[in-house]
């Protein structure tokens, strides 16, 4: 049978072929889902995440969590006022105008006023007072007046004896009175808690969370006497954020509230009060995932449980090398959770996160803290592994800048006690000693330190003190590396066994804003106090 030979089609011209291919490609793009741009490299977050999966794998999604799609919550897209500073009066020792404080208070009211279901407040005792309380109440009234039925949890950490006057039922009554008729739409659950008296452990986190979608967190305590109604306000900083990492803060608070509710009948640990006979609320309703527009900032939320909530992470196979140092212990023989307790490590992943973040630096590290060393006794003098993270960085030529609160603030815990050292030499001597162990030679250690370290006490103006004569007090908890990533939260670098929370953020754009708005002006005014400064050739005697 004869098979017919098909006729060969006419070959289209080159322009026609290109047009046809372009049309086909365009049609295909319409049919396919949008593909996001390749994610930016995140070496710092990746290293922290790996460490947390080793140390505390069973606490992922509860105490720590990595998320993408977050937005730093500025008043304008790309703005820098997601960084909430108090008082924000750089260059003015009289601090007549306090734009940072004003922005913080207005942001508190703004966020709370948008609440539709839930508001979480967490801080160190005493309860928010003065304009802090007014900002919270104003937001609650605005939301409630719109007909929203709100569940509000307020949790403070209470130091034994020191905070005996912090009474939840009294604060509930204050809020109900200030809310007036709007109180009928607000269910208040209020508690103070202490998880371990012998280990000095209580809530120290500072979180304002609204509907699990927006969060303000950092180091700022809501205390009028220290931050507002004074001529020498504490320098401090929070960040504002929207996105999945806000919900991470809610899951962390649920852990603290679960313990609080379980122990609310034990008056030696928990004092509890509520309005409308509301029960203790161990967990809040979860916000819908699609409720917040997605951003582009990757974040690790990371907290710690201190002592008394959970002994260890049963899922962890972590086996750390725990270095020793003879000068970490003082007179009191208190168990050293920071330097000598593997189980403590597994339920306080934030400490591993901070050490790891420091270790990821390749160019420079900025540390802005109240202190790097603790009050000894009763606590260990310092975290050996923090210094042992810094020492090899200095030896490798990484520049390190440390700014701490003026030691003239040394005093009792709480108001007025914003330093725990007597001299910057406590820090530089410790760092030199750890470098000596690393290099094997004291002279080499000194030269290494003085070639790469800057160490100073905080000032916010060119004057040596505030206009009223008081020393500058700094309460930051910031660690920044390479203008690429930073930690901002409530966790100090010195030993303290509290419940704390913060974020590790990897964003070069946000890191540049942090430098421009805080770290740059800080060094401009603090530099004259430097006891070590490789740029000025200042070096302590051998």
Regions found by a protein language model. Give the residues of each.
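Charged, low-complexity intrinsically disordered terminal segments
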Residues: 40-542
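N-terminal secretory signal peptides that target proteins for export/translocation
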Residues: 1-18
């Amino acid at each position: 049978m004869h098979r017919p030979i098909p006729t060969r089609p006419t070959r289209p011209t080159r322009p026609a072929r290109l047009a046809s291919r372009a049309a086909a490609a365009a049609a295909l793009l319409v049919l396919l889902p949008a593909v996001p741009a390749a994610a930016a490299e995140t070496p710092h977050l990746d290293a922290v995440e790996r460490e947390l999966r080793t140390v505390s794998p069973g606490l992922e999604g509860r105490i720590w969590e990595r998320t993408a799609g977050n937005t730093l919550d500025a008043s304008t897209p790309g703005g820098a006022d997601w960084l909430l500073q108090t008082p924000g009066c750089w260059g003015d020792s009289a601090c007549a105008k306090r734009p940072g404080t004003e922005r913080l208070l207005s942001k508190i009211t703004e966020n709370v006023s948008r609440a539709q279901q839930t508001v979480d407040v967490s801080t160190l005792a005493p309860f928010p007072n003065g304009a802090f309380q007014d900002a919270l109440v104003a937001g609650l009234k605005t939301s409630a007046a719109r007909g929203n039925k709100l569940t509000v949890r307020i949790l403070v950490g209470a130091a034994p004896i020191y905070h005996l006057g912090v009474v939840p039922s009294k604060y509930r009554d204050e809020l109900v009175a200030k809310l007036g008729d709007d109180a009928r739409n607000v269910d208040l659950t209020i508690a103070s808690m202490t998880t371990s008296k012998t280990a000095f452990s209580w809530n120290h986190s500072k979180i304002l969370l609204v509907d699990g979608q927006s969060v303000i967190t950092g180091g700022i305590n809501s205390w009028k006497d220290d931050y507002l109604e004074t001529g020498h306000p504490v320098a401090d900083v929070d960040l504002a954020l929207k996105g999945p990492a806000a919900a991470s803060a809610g899951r962390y608070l649920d852990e603290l509230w679960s313990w609080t509710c379980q122990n609310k009948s034990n008056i030696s640990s928990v004092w509890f009060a509520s309005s409308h006979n509301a029960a203790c609320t161990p967990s809040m309703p979860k916000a819908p995932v699609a409720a917040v527009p997605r951003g582009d900032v990757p974040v690790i939320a990371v907290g710690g449980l201190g002592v008394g909530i959970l002994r260890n992470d049963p899922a962890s196979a972590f086996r750390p090398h725990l270095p020793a140092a003879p000068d970490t212990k003082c007179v009191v023989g208190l168990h050293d959770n920071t330097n000598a307790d593997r189980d403590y490590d597994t339920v306080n992943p934030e400490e591993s996160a901070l050490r790891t973040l420091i270790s990821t630096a390749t160019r420079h590290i900025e540390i802005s803290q109240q202190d790097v060393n603790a009050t000894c006794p009763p606590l260990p003098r310092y975290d050996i592994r923090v210094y042992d993270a810094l020492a090899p960085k200095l030896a490798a030529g990484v520049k390190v800048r440390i700014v701490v609160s003026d030691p003239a603030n040394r005093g009792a815990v709480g108001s007025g006690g914003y330093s725990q050292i007597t001299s910057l030499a406590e820090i530089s001597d410790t760092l030199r000693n750890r470098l000596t162990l690393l290099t094997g030679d004291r002279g080499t250690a000194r030269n290494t330190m003085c070639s790469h370290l800057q160490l100073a006490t905080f000032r916010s103006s060119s004057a040596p003190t505030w206009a009223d004569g008081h020393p500058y007090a700094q309460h930051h908890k910031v660690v920044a590396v390479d203008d690429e990533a930073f930690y901002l939260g409530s966790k100090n670098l010195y030993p303290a066994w509290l419940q704390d929370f913060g974020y590790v953020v990897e964003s070069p754009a946000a890191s540049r804003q942090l430098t421009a708005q805080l770290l740059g002006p800080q060094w401009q005014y603090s530099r004259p106090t430097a006891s070590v400064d490789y740029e000025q050739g200042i070096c302590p005697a051998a």
